[in-house]
Amino acid sequence: MVSIKRYEIISFVIAAFFFLSGLSMWIAFWPIFNSELRSNYKLGANDDGSLHYAAFLYANPPMKNVMKFNLFNVTNPDEVKYLGAKPELIEVGGYAFLESEQKKYYEFSSDKTKMFYQNYKQYHYSEVDNDAGYNYNDKIMFPNSIAEGAVSTVFGPQSEFSPTAKILVSIGLVMLGEYPFISKTVKDVLMDGYEDPLLSVAHSGIFISLVNFYGYGSQLNYIPEMKTFAYLSGYNNSYDENYWINTGYNDFNKLGFVESWAGLEQLPASFWPTLEARQIKGPDSGSLSKIHLTKTDELPFFLSFMCRSFKRTYWQDGLVDGIKTMAFAVPYEEFDTTLEKNAGFRYKNQENVDYFPDWCDKNTTTSLSQCQKTANGTFLLPPGIFPLVCYPGHNAQPPFTVLVSPPHFLYSPPEVQHHLSGMNPDPEKHKPMVFHQEKTSGTALQVDVRFQVNLPVVNNKGSIMSSQMPNVIIPLFYEDSHALVKDFVMDTVWLGVIIVPRIIEYLKFVLIFISICILTTLLVIRVRVKGTVSVV
């Protein structure tokens, strides 16, 4: 009989320790890791009122967001106005702004399940981030949104103005020098604002008194509150309504989901006609996400700037600063209002204008079953376009009719792109909303948001200004926003979410392998010793 040596006992204990350690890592690491991840991601505050780290980062997004505005210069304004010609456009820009956000006046519900805040935004022009060759003082020719809005209100089918009042307005627009196209500097049209004679008259006391005297006081609601006009008028140092969001305290799967916006749990019927379209789904701007992403995930989010909710789906794998990501993008279907499921997002088209007569035409379309031209007694817009029904980010009506699309009508059929000169859609440059997220934590490391703002122009015989204009939708500008998290966030994700799990993943195999090697060595030695004793 061979006695058990001390070194064998010690070796066996070490092997058992390594094996159990490796097995414990195998079984327990991911449940513990996921529990810690959820715990650290929940939004909350300390007893002294200071925010937990995750809530602090949420309130002060650690990202550099460069927003570039590309405008469209109309090169043939006279031909469009007098001959009804196809607008010829040249894209100019981008003109860069640094956008920063800060959530203020935050508070938490007594049960810790909800967080309140106001999201303040600032925009600073950044010449160094401009595309080469462009200056903030560049002049462009663009559609006169204020005048077109006035024509739509006064001469549209829903107008309450008498024929005499319409004649006076038509003459008045000409006397004020209003023209379908105007030329201003980029800084004026984007942020600084310019004085428009129509706005000045509309806000004058005499005009308001006359309108009320003749019984058109209700029409004053259509006059924009702005005294000067700019696309981003009033947005600097402003906030986009009040939010209550889910902290994930009770249900981590609802982390960041908007519970109410502007005091509303669903959008008003004045925005969208169907209950489904009015739903507020997912987190604010998609800033928070579930963990452990898969290619089958559908991630909803609410974008107050566009007055609606979207979903994003898996697009492709990628790399951001050396970290593997899954890119989730808003798919084509979300912009297709010809689909019945998106019927609530359709443009009302009360003017009943067929803006794209070549689209879905029985003489040119091979399969009419693949497109829907009309609904509810009016013409539908082709896929890739939907209306902006609120003043972006606010529970208020827009100052004039605006349509939203991906840049260069990327998601629209060729008939839309060919209806204007200068449209060159590129999926790599113009895909509307892409979130590059780290798979395990769901952290958005890079976000690219792109959208185009378009103005519908109507040939209206009752208005001198637009009597010879074509029925056309003209792009005003598109925004190309590129947000990238700061280096310390990259480092935290790299170390805590990638390196540590990878080390544990390797270590558990190494420990189990070492334990097996030790036990195998002991067994071999034991067999040899036993064989030697037997021979003797």
Curated annotation (Swiss-Prot):
Recorded topology in the membrane: Multi-pass membrane protein
Cystine bridges: none
Residues on Extracellular side: 30-502
Glycosylation sites noted in the Swiss-Prot or TrEMBL record: N73, N236, N363, N376
Gene Ontology molecular function: scavenger receptor activity
Lineage top rank: taxon: Eukaryota
Keyword field: Glycoprotein, Membrane, Transmembrane, Transmembrane helix
Protein localization: Membrane
Topological domains annotated Cytoplasmic: 1-8, 524-536
Similarity comment: Belongs to the CD36 family.
Protein name: Uncharacterized protein R07B1.3
